[in-house]
């Protein structure tokens, strides 16, 4: 998959970083224009654009600085890391808002941020929670969706405080454990193995994984059956059909 090349090589370079204008800078206006021009065709196929979508603030900050450097900086250069996260968060609030203002069917915010899964609880509460919360609170939407398929137990404990009501998490966490931590107000999206089962397994493997996932779960409300992570390349139609059948 393509990856972003970092542009910050020292922590003191963060001070010169300028927040992009999402209306004019980079590929952003082209992406939004493409979505807008495709709305009619998307709706003709029975679909609708429901979410303003973005990578989360820690994910983007790590693209700019490097993942190792970002995580080390949480401990060695916290002032600069907060400065970087404020810039990225302000940008994301504007970008989410522009998407919602441009496409009237949007009624949700969808953030994808796996870097939050690499933080301990104290660091999560200091470096992740306030910035994610600010983004989710920036618009009044019915759905506030978070994807983190790295370590997710700490994230799950704080979903209510973040304002998140839809959570996609790693297949390595039993859905019962995430439910216990997240509470009953959050709808859970997951969580069969994406690559090992949905892409590389057989339809029988998919059905078996779904059955195992729901073992010991008496209340299946607020659960959307899916994979515990992103949809993998190579998932066959037969396996997807098996997942849909199992959901019924």
For each feature predicted by the language model, list its residue ranges.
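Active-site loop segments of alpha/beta catalytic cores
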Residues: 18-248
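A contiguous, low-structure linker/loop signature
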Residues: 1-20
């Amino acid at each position: 998959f393509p990856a972003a090349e970092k542009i910050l090589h020292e922590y003191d370079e963060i001070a010169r970083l300028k927040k992009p204008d999402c209306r004019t800078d980079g590929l952003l206006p082209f992406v939004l224009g493409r979505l807008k021009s495709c709305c009619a065709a998307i709706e003709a196929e029975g679909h609708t654009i429901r979410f303003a979508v973005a990578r989360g603030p820690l994910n983007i900050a790590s693209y700019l600085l490097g993942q190792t450097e970002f995580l080390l900086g949480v401990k060695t250069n916290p002032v600069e890391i907060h400065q970087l996260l404020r810039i990225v968060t302000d940008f994301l609030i504007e970008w989410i808002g522009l998407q919602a203002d441009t496409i009237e069917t949007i009624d949700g915010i969808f953030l994808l941020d796996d870097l939050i899964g690499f933080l301990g609880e104290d660091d999560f509460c200091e470096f992740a929670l306030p910035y994610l919360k600010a983004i989710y609170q920036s618009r009044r939407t019915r759905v506030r969706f978070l994807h983190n398929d790295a370590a997710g137990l700490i994230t799950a404990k704080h979903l209510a405080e973040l304002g998140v009501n839809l959570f996609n998490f790693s297949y390595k966490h039993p859905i019962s454990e995430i439910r216990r931590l997240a509470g009953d107000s959050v709808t859970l999206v997951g969580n069969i193995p994406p690559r090992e089962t949905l892409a590389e397994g057989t339809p029988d493997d998919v059905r078996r994984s779904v059955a195992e996932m729901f073992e010991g779960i008496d209340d299946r409300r607020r659960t959307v059956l899916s994979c515990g992570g992103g949809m993998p390349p190579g998932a066959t139609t037969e396996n997807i059909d098996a997942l849909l059948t199992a959901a019924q």
